[in-house]
């Protein structure tokens, strides 16, 4: 070819300063998403009426939302604990566990709690190194102060690997312990809480702050609650973490050219369509974590097998949804988990579940590995004797 002339040695990029031989840069692909390129697919017939689907979505959200009594009890307990910790920050007195600040995080802070799971999360950032003794001392101090304020209320306190939790008769507040970032370099695994636990609590603060700034739109919150529900009812979606669901819900509602929130029925269908198209498969651009540096794609926390499972589960449910099976998917007609494993019929149309595409590579036996290593060593020795 004419363009090859004058290259000299070293191929197209030359021998100096070119690409490393054999190196292929990772270029993630973008899965098909109709709502990003809607202009390229003009409608040939009017959209079908989805009033009934929208009403079912709202009804399901209402069923999943915490009851007024649940909301009142969790609000009361969170407020009391928050006030006690705030007082310890302002006036610690003789109490030696120094606290930097306390922050509300998780579904309580985001407004995406579900009925029957009356648990709120607080993160307490310590100024000191987080020893197990300090965590227990803080837990005991908080619960003793609460009992002094209201002796009639029955409270329990349990320490755990992330901090401690305080429970009343019908509400629980988990206190996640972390420390100021400079202390993370001074940790001793035998004395202090696990660094992964501390980093996870700091990440929860970043997540709550991002959500408040970017995803506080009511449609996003309702969609996330519905996604949490579908994750519980279909085992194939179990690998999706709460943070992945938050980002997926936000993306489905807001990530399109007009930047105006999509209607709930459209966003719900879009979630399943994006998952079915391979949004969280290897090589996909996925969703980049807005709270981490280095273009971290959130779905890479899942194994390859889990990524495939999420995809084929969504593919089956998209087909069921397109043939009017939304009541089953939403859980309004009993258990529907069988849909992803058994054939189902919708108005004469048979939907066959998608099958897994990923197969685990065969595990090599230890004997084979040893034989391989011995073979390599023998080859090395023969090469040395030849030299």
Curated annotation (Swiss-Prot):
Location (main, coarse): nucleus
Compartments where found: Nucleus
Keywords: Activator, DNA-binding, Nucleus, Transcription, Transcription regulation
A molecular function GO annotation: DNA binding
DZF domain residues: 24-371
Compositionally biased residues, Basic and acidic residues: 356-365
Region described as Disordered: spans on this chain: 352-387
Gene3D superfamilies per the UniProt record, alphabetical: 1.10.1410.40, Beta Polymerase, domain 2
Chain segments annotated as transmembrane: none
Gene Ontology CC, one term: nucleus
Signal peptide positions on this chain: none
GO BP field: positive regulation of DNA-templated transcription
Description of how the protein assembles with itself and partners: Forms heterodimers with ILF3.
General function of this protein: Appears to function predominantly as a heterodimeric complex with ILF3. This complex may function to regulate transcription of undefined genes.
Protein name: Interleukin enhancer-binding factor 2 homolog
């Amino acid at each position: 070819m004419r363009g090859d002339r004058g290259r000299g040695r070293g191929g197209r990029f030359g021998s100096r300063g070119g690409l490393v031989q054999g190196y292929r840069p990772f270029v993630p692909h973008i899965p098909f998403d109709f709502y990003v390129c809607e202009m390229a697919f003009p409608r040939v017939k009017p959209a079908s009426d989805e009033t009934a689907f929208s009403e079912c979505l709202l009804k399901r959200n209402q069923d999943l939302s915490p009851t007024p009594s649940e909301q009142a009890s969790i609000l009361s307990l969170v407020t009391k604990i928050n006030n006690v910790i705030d007082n310890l920050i302002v006036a610690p007195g003789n109490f030696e566990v120094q606290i930097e600040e306390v922050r509300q995080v998780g579904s309580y802070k985001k407004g995406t709690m579900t009925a029957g799971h009356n648990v709120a999360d607080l993160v307490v950032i310590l100024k000191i190194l987080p020893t197990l003794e300090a965590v227990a001392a803080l837990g005991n101090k908080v619960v003793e102060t609460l009992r002094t304020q209201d002796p009639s209320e029955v409270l329990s306190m349990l320490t755990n690997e992330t901090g401690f939790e305080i429970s009343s008769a019908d509400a629980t507040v988990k206190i996640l312990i972390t420390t100021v970032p400079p202390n993370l370099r001074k940790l001793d695994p035998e004395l202090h809480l696990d660094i992964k636990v501390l980093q996870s609590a700091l990440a929860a603060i970043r997540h709550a702050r991002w959500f408040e700034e970017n995803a506080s739109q009511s449609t996003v919150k309702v969609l996330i609650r519905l996604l949490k529900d579908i994750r519980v009812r279909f085992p194939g979606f179990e690998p999706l973490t709460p943070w992945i669901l938050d980002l997926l819900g936000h993306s489905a509602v807001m990530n399109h050219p007009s930047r105006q929130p999509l209607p709930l029925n459209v966003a719900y269908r879009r979630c399943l369509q994006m998952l079915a198209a391979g949004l969280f498969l290897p090589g996909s651009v996925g969703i980049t974590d807005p709270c981490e540096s280095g273009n971290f794609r959130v779905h890479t926390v899942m194994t390859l097998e889990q990524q495939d499972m999420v995809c084929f589960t969504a593919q089956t449910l998209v087909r069921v949804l397109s043939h009017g099976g939304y009541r089953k998917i939403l859980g309004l007609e009993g258990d529907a988990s069988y849909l992803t494993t058994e054939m189902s019929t919708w108005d004469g149309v048979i939907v066959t579940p998608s099958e897994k595409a990923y197969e685990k590579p065969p595990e090599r036996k230890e004997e084979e590995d040893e034989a391989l290593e011995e073979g390599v060593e023998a080859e090395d020795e023969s090469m040395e004797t030849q030299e």
